[in-house]
């Protein structure tokens, strides 16, 4: 073996951790894109690290059945008892119900609210994190993050030694506080902070300001004050500066980090999917056929139509950010298409965007159970689930403004599905990625797109 090969081997061995801890608000908690990022690469990580890979998430499903979490009384039983009795931590340990089934530690962080002011003071004194302007979800995320850091500290001191190489990866500003805590509490643990977007970049874009044209001119701290985002921006920025390694998910987001956080990423870690993420061959064909059948059946029962399998099915999806995700552009484009006299083919468009959802429509459920065909539409024939804010919803408001009411003569029909497609929504009852296979075209006209 030549010396260069030996050096390469030693460096690789030095940089390969023995244990990985990954913290995110979306572990066993499907909220947005980060859930997809973590869950679709967990299988590869699990294969490489086996049960030395630990995901840490918030225990927000207490008292309810969480289908994504398989609790185990045997996993880490001795440490769990120690964490409870000696470290005053409340955790549940189990497996994430995804390919690879990695170990998950869910943290009950409610007890830390009593120490909130002391925690924020500590973070200001050590890292200049400004929590004075906290509101909304900042406190909840911060207490979870701090608790997650405490959990990793407890696990490390109970199970590991200074010879074990451990890495803590914190995803998004919601887990920054825990990474900063570990920087001083357990400096032996290497800390990584990954931002999948920037809070200020998203807010600038969401407030109808030209982000990309004038990115070079924005000052992140100034914009945080203007947009009332001081605390979220502060934890994001200070974590990026103080952790051992700062990463982001794309070059375009790295540009945001340089300009708005005053810190370029040390590494750009682009997201990807497992090789088998998209089914192949007959499996793909079968799933696509079943998905189209479900979507067309729901549409026909809702609209009182008889749309056939030659219907062009298109869709968009994402978090409910009307401009950032291009929902406005999508609807306007459909409206123009609907007015095109040369359009001969039926078009069925789905807007799969979780809103303030109430219950699945009972009248639609009744029709779906029936084998009869219907030639009259239901009331409000463009939504599958009732909303709590039916009179103040941006999608419904724009459909009304555009005059898109799914008339029988319209070649373009639009259906708003305002819920998470987890297979148990009460109407479509299929997972999002299974339904996606049934679409002929997926459209994502985002204005703000960090590729995160």
Residue spans of the language-model regions?
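Catalytic cores of nucleotide-sugar-dependent glycosyltransferases that transfer UDP/GDP/TDP-activated
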Residues: 4-452
